[in-house]
């Protein structure tokens, strides 16, 4: 085995099966692009992104780990979010939660 090498199964790999998901339409009202990573708590993203923030509490982008989505100034975009799993403790980000979600 080579350090960092992966052995991936053949076929499709399904992500986040059975987790609650929500579609959200967003507009970037700022004058600069905003990029959001795969595991950032969407409720706490840059305030220049306008959307129904309340429904995004406890959700993140439903995209592969380590990737991101970029929102250009003035751009409308609909994205799919997925509910966090596990202990659902949120720390850091913009410090809006700092503990258990429920």
Curated annotation (Swiss-Prot):
It is an enzyme of class 3 (hydrolase). Pathway: Nitrogen metabolism; urea degradation; CO(2) and NH(3) from urea (urease route): step 1/1. The keyword Hydrolase applies. It comes from the Bacteria. Its EC number is 3.5.1.5. PANTHER family: UREASE (PTHR33569:SF1). Heterotrimer of UreA (gamma), UreB (beta) and UreC (alpha) subunits. Three heterotrimers associate to form the active enzyme. This is Urease subunit beta. The lineage of its organism: Bacteria, Pseudomonadati, Pseudomonadota, Gammaproteobacteria, Enterobacterales. The gene is ureB.
